């Protein structure tokens, strides 16, 4: 019997559960898999399967994350759930689990709490485009008015972080009751998934975006010219197309005269391919690791930006001592280290701090010594002597 082929007949969307500790994120995740499993759209998982999330390493940082997958009528979902609050912070900042949307879990018994706010803020800053609210533990609240008050409070909170509070669906659920097989609450899980299908937009495919490839290596082929190799991050590139070389030095235009993959010639390379691009009129000295090849006119290099950063603890291999404004580390951006300076910072809630301790989360302003292709929403690492001491995401380009 031939093996079954993975059918990519449904659009794929990445989501996750976020929210305050003990509001029921993991129980809800388990409930979703159990309810959908009854329709043959998931493998049922219990709380323990998800809660015992294995450790993963992303950019030198250890993160616990559980991954589950399931389907609805119209989509295939990959869903991430993190056991600890610190794991969420690291996960969202490193982009270890890219989210196209999230289910914000808030217990009706408590209403929004500190981490509810922090996760909404994080979602905004790292560019999670859409949220759906699961108002959990509704089986424990008899008074409909209390539920209405909590809903109003959540909507105001979402508004205050620039999410469309009035339009975001809030679905009353009970993860626990649904897990226990109570049909009333099982149908609420189905209602939640319909809201997710409808309100979380399908992400634009990487292949449809303008071409970009970060240069990993460069070599010359006698008689043919210079080849730049790397993985195409987005878009596609055809033989004969003009591309720009951006970053580190002045931007220059060249033409792609050949695309190779695994020593075979291609007409075009596309997102996800590891390719070598033969470039017309470019000397080996003109191009280096850390530059990017891009669709003409699609991107400009920058030196100043704002970022959200998680600074590693000593136990995670980070610094043992604090640092101050004016600190000069390396910023590892795409494929290379660029020296820069952290010119200013505040703590993540905007309050002023004199120094940054290992384990802190900060908003920072950075300035690089040479212009590089940085973009809003892009991830970077902060390194010192080749070891990672922080991870960040670009929240704003200054210049």
Curated annotation (Swiss-Prot):
Residues 174-176 are annotated as: G5. InterPro entries: EF-Tu_GTP-bd (IPR041709), EF-Tu_GTPase (IPR050055), EFTu-like_2 (IPR004161), EFTU_2 (IPR033720), G_TR_CS (IPR031157), P-loop_NTPase (IPR027417), Small_GTP-bd (IPR005225), T_Tr_GTP-bd_dom (IPR000795). It holds the Pfam family GTP_EFTU_D3. Residues 136-139 are annotated as: G4. Residues 10-204 form the tr-type G domain. SUPFAM superfamilies: EF-Tu/eEF-1alpha/eIF2-gamma C-terminal domain, P-loop containing nucleoside triphosphate hydrolases, Translation proteins. GTP binds at residues 19-26, 81-85, 136-139. It catalyses: GTP + H2O = GDP + phosphate + H(+). Residues 19-26 are annotated as: G1. Keywords: Cytoplasm, Elongation factor, GTP-binding, Hydrolase, Magnesium, Metal-binding, Nucleotide-binding, Protein biosynthesis. Mg(2+) binds at residue 26. Residues 81-84 are annotated as: G3. Residues 60-64 are annotated as: G2. PROSITE patterns: G_TR_1, G_TR_2. It is an enzyme of class 3 (hydrolase). It is found in: Cytoplasm. One of its GO terms (molecular function) is GTPase activity. It comes from the Bacteria. Its EC number is 3.6.5.3. GO terms for cellular component: cytosol. GTP hydrolase that promotes the GTP-dependent binding of aminoacyl-tRNA to the A-site of ribosomes during protein biosynthesis. Monomer. Belongs to the TRAFAC class translation factor GTPase superfamily. Classic translation factor GTPase family. EF-Tu/EF-1A subfamily. PANTHER family: ELONGATION FACTOR TU, MITOCHONDRIAL, ELONGATION FACTOR TU-RELATED. This is Elongation factor Tu. It comes from Prochlorococcus marinus (strain MIT 9215). The gene is tuf.
